A protein has these predicted regions:
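Short low-complexity linker/loop segments enriched in small residues
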Residues: 614-732
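Hydrophobic, well-ordered secondary-structure elements that form the walls
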Residues: 603, 707, 737
Length: 792
């Protein structure tokens, strides 16, 4: 069948469809491949073409039906979004306060809730089957068996049984996650069919890219170009080569299996429905490829697959099958409507919608900005910043800085049916991590499960290598911070569902007004409340609960799960996509501007988030004066306690002030440590980073701190000791080296305590006479004393 004739036939079959040249070539090649396949089975050319034509006609009808449904769905989505009284960009990520005070539904929150639905259920089933530790061990020998069972889970004829029940159970559970991921996307407009022997497609773009050369492609092709009979059946050699090169390009660019180019007006439902599967002949072939170019073990691949599915679903749920097109159209309509008001407020809204940052935020939320400009630059710098986390945050728990999360979570209780004091008591008990099974039932309390610990301290970084990410997460486990945060989030999540169950006998209008506002922001009003409260029952902790997963109405269940997920994120002060976007100015990783922004603003997303989430909630519907006083006073109190714990590590404590100046200094220091002014990120850093004399360090960010100290030391050595000074150039150099080493040494709580109690002053005084006395004078001015004075 001539190519021109085939193209003409395609156009005749779909006269209203405007095909791109690439689509026409792709369809033509597929038709020709299928004809050759039929001929290889013994059919005449005419019979082969007739068979393929019949199949293509059926597929065309199905595609037309899908397109019609998609168009109708997009119309409904646009109507829904137009009816909402908030700017288009606010639907991407809850911006807290201002024009979005009555809404909290967002792509970002839905993404997180959907991912929780998949992974918490999976974790519970793996644990019940007693294979959770086996799966997470990533043992190569056992994973071979797991892959084989995953490959044959629906068709036992695909290979022999391994005879390993644990592998069979794990494959069944992980397979359910893959099936659920496909189903949730199909419900929103995708049409993803089952693929025989489907294995998760989670390829590492950095490994595939290598140095981007032909040699890197040849190395990749050595594995992916063989043992794929089904993928290559009926294709000519040049077509196989074109397919392989296209897949390599898609994988190394990060587009393969992803949401795609968020800058284009593509049909997302159709895009995720397209075949983006690399089928190997056997599970062993897939395992070999995954070990060479995958993101980790099988559990990692399944989690990455679930994450993409959750994000795709959240985007389509909010913006339909053509999300960027609908978003742009909606933004333009709302912008014009705002300007048409001819008021100052309207003009501000219109200008905000017009800002290019909104397109950047769309890229952040949909994931396209996870793909950096230059992967090598991005990866190197992201790993440096990850190392900076360990240098600066090793004592985040023992040093008391993490305690601020207790009152922040307690404030969330106050908005959701509890009281602040009840919240403080709950969160203090939660430090010890009780009711973790209940926490998982309500999808709360496992940063490690959702692999989100490392992202808490990044402006955006998704470029951290797998090995470094694992190392940093292990580091936070060692510090106790991961466990502390999981326990805090779990305690809040369980309390939220308990408050729902406790109030099940009340009607919606009988609830506290603040609580009604919190529920309404997630689309929960009297009808949804009446549906949900009918499912109140005693849970394993002996108290009444309304657990979202138990609610029979799927739509209502989703709203309540979003409500729980959103408030847990608020209590944890997790940076939103909006906050991260603001902090880095909408720049992209791997670009000069993007990397500079990320270095200068590392940890600063906490400051923005504090103002957005915490104070934003207190300005919603009017100024909540009692709430502001509670938040400020409790944060200051935790800042004071944190300062005392920090003193234990640094071998110096704060004396009680004896004058007004001392009290002002103590209260100010406690307020800054507690993040009262939204400076939570700075409060996590060392004292020097908060002092007014170290403005240069504040400007360059924590990674630049050693450079500032090094420059200062070199300058001191160059200038030499001042007049009347007893120091020498050599001693100035030693002091400078000591300072720089302190900047780059991880302040893990145990080593920090040993260092501060046993080492520095004795050595410093030997090398630099008078160092202890001078430091003691500084401490006296700051009203501080040593716990254990150093030897003179």
């Amino acid at each position: 069948m001539a190519t021109d004739a085939c193209i003409a036939a395609i156009r005749a079959a779909a006269p209203t469809r405007q095909f791109t040249p690439d689509e026409l070539v792709s369809i033509t090649e597929e038709v020709q491949r299928q004809v050759r396949e039929q001929m290889a089975l013994g059919k005449t050319p005419r019979a082969a073409k007739a068979t393929v034509a019949t199949a293509m006609q059926a597929e065309a009808k199905a595609a037309a039906a899908r397109a019609k449904w998609s168009a109708y769905n997009d119309i409904l989505k646009m109507a829904d979004r137009e009816a909402e009284n908030r700017p288009a960009y606010a639907m991407l990520s809850d911006t807290g306060g201002g024009t979005t005070r009555n809404y909290a539904t967002s792509v970002e929150n839905s993404h997180k809730a959907l991912l929780g639905d998949l992974l918490y259920r999976q974790q519970a089933e793996l644990k019940a089957a007693k294979v959770d530790k086996r799966v997470l061990s990533r043992d190569p020998v056992w994973e071979n068996k797991l892959a084989a069972e995953l490959d044959r889970r629906e068709d036992p004829t695909r290979g022999p049984s391994t005879g390993d029940k644990s592998a069979e159970d794990a494959a069944r559970i992980l397979g359910k996650t893959l099936d659920a991921s496909r189903a949730m996307q199909n419900r929103q407009g995708a049409f993803i069919g089952k693929v025989e022997g489907y294995m998760p497609q989670a390829w590492d773009m950095w490994k595939a890219r290598g140095d981007g050369s032909e040699a890197a492609y040849a190395k990749w092709k050595e594995i992916f170009g063989k043992n794929r009979d089904k993928d290559f059946a009926g294709l000519l050699p040049q077509q196989i080569e074109a397919k392989l090169r296209g897949q390599w390009q898609a994988i190394k660019s990060g587009v393969f299996g992803s949401i795609g180019d968020a800058g284009g007006h593509y049909d997302l439902g159709a895009r995720v429905s397209q075949s983006r599967t690399i089928n190997f002949n056997t599970a062993a072939d897939w395992v070999a490829a995954n070990r060479a170019y995958g993101i980790g073990g099988i559990a990692d691949a399944v989690s990455a697959h679930a994450d993409r599915a959750a994000r795709n679903t959240a985007v389509m749920e909010m913006f339909g099958n053509k999300p960027k097109q609908l978003f742009d159209a909606l933004r333009e309509k709302k912008m014009n409507a705002a300007h048409a008001l001819n008021t100052e407020a309207g003009n501000k809204i219109g200008d905000a919608l017009k800002a290019s940052r909104n397109s950047s935020l769309f890229g952040d939320v949909t994931g396209i900005h996870d793909i950096p400009g230059d992967h090598r630059i991005s990866t190197i710098n992201a790993n440096v910043r990850a190392l900076s986390q360990m240098i600066h945050l090793g004592s985040i728990l023992a040093g008391g800085q993490a305690l601020i999360h207790i009152p922040l979570n307690a404030m969330a209780h106050r908005l959701t049916g509890g009281s602040f004091l009840e919240g403080m008591a709950t969160q203090l008990r939660g430090v010890f991590g009780k009711d973790q099974d209940m926490a998982h039932a309500v999808h709360a309390g496992s940063d490690a499960l959702l692999q989100s610990t490392i992202r808490r301290f990044h402006s955006d970084d998704g470029s951290v290598g797998q090995r470094m990410a694992g190392f940093v997460n292990s580091f936070y486990k060692a510090t106790g911070f991961s466990g502390f945060m999981d326990n805090q989030k779990g305690a809040l999540g369980v309390a939220l569902t308990h408050y729902l169950g406790r109030a099940a006998g009340k009607t919606f209008d009988q609830l506290d007004p603040r609580w009604q506002t919190s529920l309404t922001r997630y689309g929960i009003e009297a009808p949804e409340w009446d549906v949900a409260r009918a499912f109140a029952q005693k849970a394993s902790d002996g108290r009444m609960h309304v657990i979202p997963a138990d609610i029979a109405d799927a739509g209502v269940a989703r709203k309540f799960q979003n409500y729980v997920t959103g408030h847990v994120a608020q209590g944890a002060n997790e940076p939103t996509a909006w906050a991260r976007n603001v902090v880095v100015g909408g720049t992209r990783a791997g670009t000069p501007a993007g990397e500079i922004a990320r270095y200068l603003t590392q940890f600063k997303s906490f400051a923005v988030t504090m103002m957005q989430r915490q104070f934003g909630s207190l300005l919603r519907g009017g100024v909540d004066v009692p709430g502001i006083m509670l938040l400020a006073s409790s944060a200051m109190g935790m800042g004071f306690i944190g300062g005392q714990l920090h003193g234990l590590l640094t071998n110096q404590h704060q004396n009680m002030p004896t004058d007004a100046e001392g009290w002002v200094k103590l209260l100010t220091d406690s307020a800054v440590r507690g993040g009262v002014f939204g400076l939570l990120g700075d409060a996590m850093l060392r004292d020097g980073m908060r002092s007014g004399s170290d403005v240069a360090k504040q400007l360059v960010g924590p990674v630049g701190e050693p450079l500032v100290d090094l420059i200062g030391a070199l300058n001191n050595v160059r200038q030499g000791p001042g007049e009347g000074s007893r120091t020498t150039r050599g001693q100035e150099a030693i002091e400078g080296v000591h300072k720089v080493l302190g900047d780059i040494t991880p302040n893990f709580w145990a080593t920090s305590a040993v260092y501060n109690y046993l080492f520095p002053y004795m050595v410093a005084n030997t090398l630099h006479p008078g160092a202890v006395q001078r430091h003691q004078e500084v401490m006296r001015k700051n009203n501080q004393s040593w716990y254990i004075p150093p030897s003179p």
